[in-house]
Amino acid sequence: MDTINQRIGEMLARVRATRPLIHHITNLVVMNDTANVTLHVGGLPVMAHDVEEVAEMVTHAGALVLNVGTLSPDWVESMLVAGRQANELDIPIVLDPVGAGATQLRTMTNLKLLRSLHIGVVRGNGGEIGALSGAGGEMRGVESIAAPENPLTAARTLAQTYRTVVALTGARDIITDGERGFIVSNGHIWLTTLTGTGCMATTMVAAFAAVERDYLLAAAGGLAMFGLAAELAAEKAHGPASFKTALFDQIYNLTPEQVAAGARIAELEW
């Protein structure tokens, strides 16, 4: 795994050197935090939602984030327009299917995006991935309260069905393209005390995907760095508020060498 860890460190170095624009069509709850995370990891954020400009904006982007946390018909149309342009230009799309499984509207909207666009990475929790794969799982609002019985099978099924990379995040993160896969063990329980940390993780994945065509490895790298930052932040924090501040500081201050040394990634065995 040393070579994989080295490649992850090199990806972070490329993000910092090239400062890719990450175009978000995202939810109102996390917009400010995900913009800041994009800046701290080394990218440039833009939150452009209007259907009249998204196709033009995405032409400048290194990656496109589609996040359905605060759904509206206008924004879904913008996601489809931006996504088609991203596909035309071979720009990676990272989908965050917030709340899939909680309501029929959320589930069907995410399935429409998956069927209409080629999605590079789907980053979701166990309940969301279970709902989209047909494997089950339980959501309360946008929070996963029960993962599918076999999360690995759910992730693999969704990846194979839509020819995408699935990053199922939890106590340990499962990342697979349906054939290969990784387990990322970095992280901290305090991530569950803040709203929007899954959306922040999605932004990290997008930043890495903007500089790495192997989206499986990019997803593993973004999640490993985010989890490592959380571990280090928890050492300095006294509760959720100080943890959030420390998390942002750690994302900003982590070096490629530290990420390569601290990432805990194992190859999946089927």
UniProtKB/Swiss-Prot annotation:
Swiss-Prot/TrEMBL cofactor(s): Mg(2+)
Pfam family, one: HK
Pathway: Cofactor biosynthesis; thiamine diphosphate biosynthesis; 4-methyl-5-(2-phosphoethyl)-thiazole from 5-(2-hydroxyethyl)-4-methylthiazole: step 1/1
Top-level EC class as recorded in UniProt: transferase
GO terms for biological process, alphabetical: thiamine biosynthetic process; thiamine diphosphate biosynthetic process
Gene3D superfamilies the UniProt entry points to: 3.40.1190.20
GO MF annotation terms: ATP binding; hydroxyethylthiazole kinase activity; magnesium ion binding
Catalytic activity: 5-(2-hydroxyethyl)-4-methylthiazole + ATP = 4-methyl-5-(2-phosphooxyethyl)-thiazole + ADP + H(+)
Enzyme Commission designation: 2.7.1.50
Binding-site residues for substrate, renumbered to this chain: 47, 196
Record key words, sorted: ATP-binding, Kinase, Magnesium, Metal-binding, Nucleotide-binding, Thiamine biosynthesis, Transferase
Coiled coil: none
Keyword Secreted: no
Binding-site residues for ATP, renumbered to this chain: 123, 169
Family: Belongs to the Thz kinase family.
Function: Catalyzes the phosphorylation of the hydroxyl group of 4-methyl-5-beta-hydroxyethylthiazole (THZ).
The protein, known as: Hydroxyethylthiazole kinase
